[in-house]
Amino acid sequence: MRQQPHYLELLSPARDAAIAREAILHGADAVYIGGPGFGARHNASNSLRDIADLVPFAHRYGARIFVTLNTILHDDELEPAQRLITDLYNTGVDALIVQDMGILELDIPPIELHASTQCDIRIVEKAKFLADVGFSQIVLARELNLSQIAAIHQATDATIEFFIHGALCVAYSGQCYISHAQTGRSANRGDCSQACRLPYTLKDDQGRVVSYEKHLLSMKDNDQTANLGALIDAGVRSFKIEGRYKDMSYVKNITAHYRQMLDAIIEQRGDLARASVGRTEHFFVPSTEKTFHRGSTDYFVNARKGDIGAFDSPKFIGLPVGEVLNVAKDYLDVEATEPLANGDGLNVLIKREVVGFRANTVEKTGHNRYRVWPNDMPADLHKVRPHHPLNRNLDHNWQQALTKTSSERRVAVDIMLGGWQEQLILTLTSEDGVCITHTLDGVFEEANNSEKALNNLKAGLAKLGQTPYYARDMQVTLPAALFVPNSLLNQFRREAIDMLDAARLAHYQRGRRKPVAQPAPVYPQTHLSFLANVYNHKAREFYHRYGVQLIDAAYEAHQEKGEVPVMITKHCLRFAFNLCPKQAKGNIKSWKATPMQLVHGDEVLTLKFDCRPCEMHVIGKIKNHILKMPQPGSVVASVSPEALMITLPKRRGV
């Protein structure tokens, strides 16, 4: 079910159900969360019970719950995945986010399907194909620019989802195999070893060092705050925040930030609306600078930029807050541009490495000057010279505000009380149009003080503090001001609210899986390499059904034993170091994008440059010991070494 074209959906991540609830309270229109398995985040799974409890909470606000089932599946996992999908459907979740096309060939309920960013959706033809085979919502590649997004939007009937904030994978999503090649941990199965965050030395084709021991594959974090309006104009309707590993404070803060940004656009334009209901009030000032980030970039949305990498450090440095004046044995003196507090996280950069510490005690010693005693004094801190820059990556006082109730979300209710002396009639209508009527029989006398009685009735009916509602409009149409005991009025109101709650949940409609377009679509390629990530026979059947003739096995099947692209990325190190032929002045033909090397310890990777699409291919080879390991997801691979030993036949004489 494609969303209404004027609805804007803020989609937040959740590591667990508690974070999901807070994301919704802070303004999310939808939340994506991992289920018990197959969720592309190895350590971010949740039980069916937790998800089942979360669903009605979300639906009270018209918010949707998407469950990630976006790993590629081994044949041995197809049956368990099919059972899990049925169980998830029965909990009431709104949609599945999937990568493996084999899922579309399984016998599953008619649950709405969303195409994961792992599907590597960069071109119109692929986006249209996915929309035509049954995907209601598609997550586009982060590397696309505004015109590419607009072209896909115009060509498909699927809701366009796009990442607007959070960590950036340097590779096209779904096109990174370096983790599996080096460690046996597959990124396409949610177990990335993050080789992109390691330090590398870059060498040219003559072996000369271009850059030494820098984090050359580590990207800054995505931040599309300034581009929200342009993304809306391009057709984006679901605005996705990355971060299913992020903590509660991060999700609260970033969700609140984008809620306020989108609400301002909605109010300004008038022809747009949020995709869920409720009024959100935040009790803190959101700041994208105060929770984890590696610096900010809008990546390729507008144009290629040179400054997209976090080469110095993949860690969170924070904001500048002053400089170090002196370092003693167990304290340091600093001059600060902002007040410091006990518990602050502070750091300095020494030879491109972050040296951090927690402030145990902070004492003001003069105007903008402080003496700071760390919990543990880092030895490297004594290398710092006077006036060395000081950063803060944990603002203790600001973080404390996020540990408390930091937001409130309530749904508007219009209240009408009518009737007569023998019966009260209470009508509640929620902002999403659900209406209930509740009656209270009795003998209610006219009050001696009609003004006071009327005010008491209104005040009693408006007491909605422990509910997710607030009174937007109040009308009393009784023929006279009647006296109603507070105990009766409170019970009457509570019963009506319970009725409204039940009616709204019953009225909620979740989407269904789209039917396949007729005539049946044809996949835009007839030959699929390992880059298509086909890992099971059901995925093969799917692609054969739609016209693909030759299908290579996924990289995790261990059939690619030679050197292949283990990472394909829009990030180009030639461009970053002004070595791109397109940057050359004069005779461009004299410049060649010759291969380069990335070196980390004993690991040597070759860089090849495809200048027509402006891509860099990282070439590597799977390690021999990984080739001998069981295929990820197979029954053998899922058995512990101890359990596997039990299954082996015993040798004679042992």
Go through the PLM ranges and name each one:
Residues 122-126:
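Short, glycine/polar-rich helix-capping loops at beta-to-alpha or helix-loop-helix junctions
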Residues 102-109:
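Short active-site loop/helix that positions an aromatic residue
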